UniProtKB/Swiss-Prot annotation:
Source lineage: Bacteria, Bacillati, Actinomycetota, Actinomycetes, Kitasatosporales
Annotated 5-phospho-alpha-D-ribose 1-diphosphate binding sites: R96, K97, K100, H102, E122, D123, T124, S125, T126, T127, G128, G129, S130
Pfam families: Pribosyltran
Source species of the chain: Streptomyces coelicolor (strain ATCC BAA-471 / A3(2) / M145)
Gene, per the UniProt record: pyrE
Name of the featured protein: Orotate phosphoribosyltransferase
InterPro entries: OPRT (IPR023031), Or_phspho_trans_dom (IPR004467), PRibTrfase_dom (IPR000836), PRTase-like (IPR029057)
Amino acid sequence: MTDVRGELLQQIKDKAVVHGKVTLSSGLEADYYVDLRRITLDGEAAPLVGQVLLDLTADLEFDAVGGLTMGADPVAASMLHAAAARGRRLDAFVVRKTAKAHGLQRRVEGPEIKGRRVVVVEDTSTTGGSPLTAVEAVREAGAEVVAVATIVDRATGAGEKIQDGAGVPYLYAYGKDELGLD
């Protein structure tokens, strides 16, 4: 475990893990919630997210990252900044839940991704629904999705659903066991 990876893990444990009954965005109930917005929007932790996810995806060739708004937005931004700090150009994009009815009426916002290799990111996924929605939109925009990457995997089948449904690798930085949530 790199120092950065260990530091982010501790930040997640300290700031993002909330115990108690909660209803997840998927509609499922859980005995805990990992509120990763407390990490991805935190001035101390967010830069670590970018570094850890860049390391996680280091073996992949891609030049843009993004996913379904809102969970993916700060993840993609942190990766963009971490890449710049390493002297690497990496663009970010945002996938809207539905296309805008005005302006350019785009569903995928940001630099053009048509013809580009991209990684779809998410903070965490329970059912795989948000990343799969993003993969579909990104493919419709003409990009090649090389992987889906998340910060935390809840071990609830999202990875399998993404691999089977989208046919791309599913990567995650931390499993729920590392967070002491077994």
